[in-house]
Amino acid sequence: MSQNTPSLRELEHHNAFVERHIGPNDAEIAQMLDVVGHASLDAMTDAIVPAKIKSPAPLALPESMTEVQALAKIRAIADKNTVLRSFIGQGYYGTHTPNVILRNILENPAWYTAYTPYQAEISQGRMEALINFQTLCADLTGMEIANASLLDEATAAAEAMTLAKRSAKSKSDTFFVHDAVHPQTLELLRTRAEPMGIVLRVGTPAEALEAEAFGLLLQYPDTFGQVGDYKALVDAVHARGGLVAVATDLLALTLLAAPGEWGADIVVGNSQRFGVPFGFGGPHAAFMACRDAYKRSMPGRLIGVSIDAQGNPAYRLTLQTREQHIRREKATSNICTAQVLLAVMASMYAVYHGPEGLTRIARRTHRLASILAAALRNAGVQVGGDFFDTLHVTGVHADEIHAKARAAGYNLRAIDSDSVGISLDETTTRADIVAVAAVFGASLDVDALDASTADALPAGLLRQSAFLTHPVFNTHHSEHELLRYLRSLADKDLAMDRTMIPLGSCTMKLNATAEMIPVTWPEFSQIHPLVPADQALGYKELIDTLEAMLVECTGYDAVSLQPNSGAQGEYAGLLAIRAYHRSRGEGHRDICLIPDSAHGTNPASAQMCGMKVVVTKTDANGNVDVEDIRLNAEKYSDRLAAIMMTYPSTHGVFEEEVVEICEIIHKHGGQVYTDGANMNALVGVAKPGKWGSDVSHLNLHKTFCIPHGGGGPGVGPCAVKEHLAPFLPGKLGDNGPVGMVSAASFGSASILPISWMYIAMMGREGLRKATQVAQLNANYIAKRLAPHFKTLYTGRNGLVAHECILDVRPLEKTSGIGAEDVAKRLIDFGFHAPTLSFPVAGTLMVEPTESESLHELDRFIDAMIQIREEITAIEDGRLDREDNPLKNAPHTATAVTASEWTHAYPRELAAFPLASLKQSKYWPPVARVDNVYGDKNVMCACIPVDAYKDDEVEA
């Protein structure tokens, strides 16, 4: 082989994916390093990261795989799962995902790469979809308002419990739980209640009649399928000052009287059976609906209707002062990431089928269940009555039944030794009920029994009220119509398929197509979370190997993948610390130190664990004030439980004293919790588990490439050192000392292949390079913008970590232009704004990630420089201080093409501030949204059609 001939190994190009994932190529990296002032990535990293925390050796992970190799490897893992027909129920049901929704939402980056809709003007499409979801949930439950999704049904039930606690007139500390709620719901309630001083009492509805409690949770239909009449019970609870929460099934409510109609105050549930697969437990969009009186205490995101600057209807996140990122230690919930992508799917399932289609699916499911029940009874098998879709079969040898069922290709619910459950669903066929009947020794003539069998729903609980009457649910029933509706919504929004999203602390990096492909494979998507272990061997291998990968990346000793959001990972980590102290006879340790720059979820999670939050100071350079930490650690030495700190800090710098801080906390008996929100600055460079940290949560939807989905799904694994490992979240049936923090034992399991694929395709060297280029991109932006905008905080050598805070506060004094004006003006350039006013009010925090190319970085920089020039023009008097392109941003196509233009600047400056925008232009669908109007006039359901009537247009 000649000297110039590349080797076969080079030609195999094993690091091809690394080059696809990382935006700048090597030549561009060299060019950018020159701007930053360093000769190499390693030299730059040495100048950024404190030497005492740097990892001495490369990650002990395999080298990178190609996309083809990784897909083949994960296909082999998936094939170890066994897909049977699962009629287990217990909150999870088979469903058909309409292909138009599968392809155009779940597999469409216009939907799955979007961020939480904080910037209303560029999020109108997905907020309309979420308004549809809220309307769906409110209509079917008979409530006045519903939120834009929660993490899972069990979490929603726990949130209902705490909502009832703070809203009920009763002063009792007892929450009464129906003994026929789903088991996973009861386990999570136990986890959540004890640290908050809530006493759970579990019993029958009859026992609840006389109970003194601030709240009651009912399941309707219950976990065994029974449909109960609870009107008298609800009245009794109300008479004693309590509130009633109901966990329900949306499909059943197309046939059954809505809980709101018989007195419920709060209704929760799971929308999974509206087109979202099992996924071994998630992700699925739960919901909460409640009476209007409780809307300001309701957890989670809430989409409302306001008006824009031109008086047109516009959607926005409403009542945000309820949320954890604002209320912090006064919050009563730490919900942040929810399940927006799945809520969008469920809403469009309802839009596609409409009320008649949903009712038809429900009637067919109930009809099949009624026919099967009749066949079993005819064969002498005992079956409960008054059901929707679930049969409780008693008096059988359960082990024998399960063995026969599995041999026939079916999973039934394991209840006890002499009873089983059978939950039918949209996917059930005639052949299925014939086969299941045969398992019990029953024969079944479907047509004959159909003609002779009555429905099994109680006559007094049949739904009489209309639902989903809004035109959106009665229009898009052909595939063409839905396809075009989805396209029209996607076109209103900015997601990563169109532009960089430079949100600080959010890590909006590439969600590669190859990573997404396994998610919809039946071997992952069609596995019920409660199948026998031998049917989920592929999932076991996937979970075990991913946990090992994360252990290696973090330096910890054990990982739980159960938390289904970053906030839940925080909660799990703090519960582990709490349980550890209690195991050592130090349960009195209840003080949690939290810097004032911390994420809002940190203090919210701490108070949910029964801890008292003590806020520590930040110094003038943006660093955690070590002396203030030392003083507080000494002051609360006997009670110190933990410190929660983000590293690198939320101010975008690597603090030099992190090891010293860990030593201070440990000296006083506390544990160190390191928030993993900024792990994208660390992978392959430093490991928190090696510098003294005891526990972290990670964000797989940030660092490890699960897409944000417009506000979820997420996965927030909890990683711990060995001494905390026994206190990781328990699993259903094996609860452990802490209990469950999510409904499913492995959380949102079906999206774990995304992170597995990312790590496998990047390999040890690719992961380190990704971290370094993330640092480079942030510093390149900071250096290029330095003559125009000051970077508020830098670390040693004048460098930032992986994000930078641009300070626009001085400009507000000289021009009247604030950070929000800059954020809105960026929309005219086709950009999603950076993070606004966090962690410092009046600033913009920029995190470009490693995936953005030099071209895209320069496009953003050019936009920011042009904005600075416009601010200069205001300062100089060339642009009016009030009537200027920043104050009036964003500019809609309607505004700039109107026959009359009254502004003191030209239309071209409004629409095309840079010439390059004439080649490709994003037009926001609405002008600047009025936040004050939206909070004063709360409306959280579909907009009446007449609100869209056009004003008269001049000829």
Curated annotation (Swiss-Prot):
Q: Does the keyword Nucleotide-binding apply?
A: no
Identify the EC number(s). 1.4.4.2
Q: What class of enzyme is it?
A: oxidoreductase
Q: Supply one GO CC term from the record.
A: glycine cleavage complex
Q: Which UniProt keywords apply?
A: Oxidoreductase, Pyridoxal phosphate
> Which InterPro entries does the protein's record reference?
GcvP, GDC-P_C, GDC-P_N, GDC_P, PyrdxlP-dep_Trfase, PyrdxlP-dep_Trfase_major, PyrdxlP-dep_Trfase_small
Picking any one GO molecular function of the record gives:
glycine dehydrogenase (decarboxylating) activity
Which Pfam families does the entry mention?
GcvP2_C, GDC-P
Check the record and name the SUPFAM superfamilies matching this protein. Answer: PLP-dependent transferases
Q: Give the reactions, separated by semicolons, that this protein catalyses.
A: N(6)-[(R)-lipoyl]-L-lysyl-[glycine-cleavage complex H protein] + glycine + H(+) = N(6)-[(R)-S(8)-aminomethyldihydrolipoyl]-L-lysyl-[glycine-cleavage complex H protein] + CO2
Keyword Oxidoreductase in the entry? The reply is yes
Required co-factor? pyridoxal 5'-phosphate
Instruction: Give all N6-(pyridoxal phosphate)lysine modified positions.
Output: 702
Q: Which GO terms describe its biological process?
A: glycine decarboxylation via glycine cleavage system
Instruction: Describe the task this protein carries out.
Output: The glycine cleavage system catalyzes the degradation of glycine. The P protein binds the alpha-amino group of glycine through its pyridoxal phosphate cofactor; CO(2) is released and the remaining methylamine moiety is then transferred to the lipoamide cofactor of the H protein.
HAMAP family assigned to the protein according to its UniProt record, in alphabetical order = GcvP
UniProt similarity note: Belongs to the GcvP family.
Please describe the quaternary structure of this protein: The glycine cleavage system is composed of four proteins: P, T, L and H.
Q: What is this protein called?
A: Glycine dehydrogenase (decarboxylating)
Species of the source? Stenotrophomonas maltophilia (strain K279a)
